[in-house]
């Protein structure tokens, strides 16, 4: 399972989302990839998805949420994405 979190430097919501997703991903012994929208990989992804806001989470390349999820919501998204 590939989990990516699009963030922006200095974004307080992104820091909060990162904490939530780090916890949820660690429980699954998976890895979280952070993509800053100011870097080429992050820019390319935001353009491809036509995103105007961060944080945003992708699981296996599919946009699953924008904004800050609760830990319970993050766990649920991970459970739904298992396959």
Where are these regions (language model features)?
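Thiol-based oxidoreductase modules, predominantly thioredoxin-like and allied folds used
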Residues: 30-42
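Short beta->alpha junction loops/turns
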Residues: 10, 38, 63-64
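Non-catalytic, surface beta->alpha helical segment in thiol-disulfide oxidoreductase systems
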Residues: 59-83
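Short amphipathic alpha-helix with an adjacent loop that forms part of the alpha/beta core around
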Residues: 44-48
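Structural micro-motif
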Residues: 49-58
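Non-catalytic interaction surface on structured domains
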Residues: 18-21, 28-31, 59, 71
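Local sequence-structure signature of Cys/Sec-based thiol-disulfide redox active-site neighborhoods
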Residues: 1-26
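Compositionally biased, disordered extreme N-termini, encompassing classical targeting presequences
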Residues: 1-2, 29, 82-83
